[in-house]
């Protein structure tokens, strides 16, 4: 799991090219921390936090994580991604556990052209036709 999350971080950083002008790289993380999928979301959060502890900087820039609970709900997942993009101004997003939640949040990220990497999505529709 640690290697997977580290790989995800590297992929996100590669996709965010111009985002390295600031001293801090803001990465959003949206996971089901409550609700029926909370167990999987908690495990993924532990993996993301472990990878962040191992790699708190990239190319000399501090990595700051913004974690949001999508409450195991598709509407909340879309709202969480919107909040990460509009309020927190993240340059990339990691998440989420649950393909249906990833598809809901993915639509928002795609429209905003913010790269998003799913850590455990299994449905091919999550990435089908997506550039970000």
Where are the regions that the model predicts?
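Sec-dependent signal peptide recognition
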Residues: 2-10, 14
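Short, well-structured alpha-helical segments in soluble
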Residues: 67, 74-91
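Extracytoplasmic/secreted envelope proteins and their assembly/folding machinery
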Residues: 45, 49-52, 78-82, 102-110
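Short beta-strand elements in bilobed, periplasmic/extracellular small-molecule ligand-binding domains
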Residues: 58-71, 130-132
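Short helix-capping segments at alpha-helix termini
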Residues: 55-61, 112-114
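Extracytoplasmic ligand/sensor domains, especially the bilobed periplasmic-binding protein
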Residues: 89-132
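Extracytoplasmic "Venus flytrap"
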Residues: 28-47, 55, 68-75, 97-100
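Sec/Tat signal peptide C-region and signal peptidase I cleavage site
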Residues: 16-21
């Amino acid at each position: 799991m640690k290697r997977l999350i580290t790989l995800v971080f590297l992929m996100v950083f590669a996709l965010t090219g111009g985002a390295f002008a600031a001293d801090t790289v803001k990465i959003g993380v949206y996971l089901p921390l409550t609700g029926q999928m909370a167990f999987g979301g908690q495990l993924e959060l532990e993996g993301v936090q472990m990878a962040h502890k191992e790699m708190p900087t990239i190319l000399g820039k501090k990595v700051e994580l913004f974690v949001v609970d999508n409450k195991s709900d598709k509407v909340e997942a879309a709202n969480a991604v919107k909040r990460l993009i509009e309020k927190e101004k993240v340059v990339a997003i990691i998440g989420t556990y649950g393909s249906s939640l990833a598809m809901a949040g993915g639509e928002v990220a795609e429209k905003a052209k913010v790269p998003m990497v799913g850590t455990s999505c299994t449905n091919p529709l999550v990435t089908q036709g997506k550039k970000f």
